[in-house]
Amino acid sequence: MPQPRPYKVALNGYGRIGRCVVRALCERGAKAGFEVVAINDLADMASLEYLTRFDSTHGRFPGEVRVEGQYLHINDHRIKVSRSPTPEGVDWAGLEVDLVLECSGVYNTREDGQRFLDAGAPRVLFSQPMASERDVDATVVFGINQHRLTGRELLVSAASCTTNCSVPLLRLLDQAIGLEYITITTIHSAMNDQPVIDAYHHE
């Protein structure tokens, strides 16, 4: 029986989340059912290669990583790299992707999502929460409400890291004892834009 073709994914943004996606899919191999075929990021090719190869948290990448022209080769996969500062600068349709995974954190409104769709992206999954629930067709925490997806959604958010950590526990508590109101305090790991010395910062 022929195997179904992998779901083709393009990453817009190759920071922490984008690189973790690539690593996770490569570690799972063909059984993941997904293949990253394109990356759009402003960094130069040498930096993309280095940051793929070395990770302070997860260690060295367990495979081959090399650059050839405008392609990042990871094991036996060839990933097309573009450096457009806007969604409109990438030919998503020409890349024949099934999904754009928006990992830059820059875009969080329905208007932003429409820019990807107008540029040829068939669907967009945002790795961050949106500005409001009106800005997305669905917000999904996997293991909690993914069954509500109909397949007609074009703009979906994977919520925030805090939401993904807290909601499964809150669901268990709600089922066991019932919850009316909750307050959550998050101790968050350092972000890539936070200085380690005293400096101005929006948060």
What are these regions (language model features)?
Residues 2-196, 200-203:
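N-terminal Rossmann-like NAD(P) cofactor-binding subdomain of oxidoreductases
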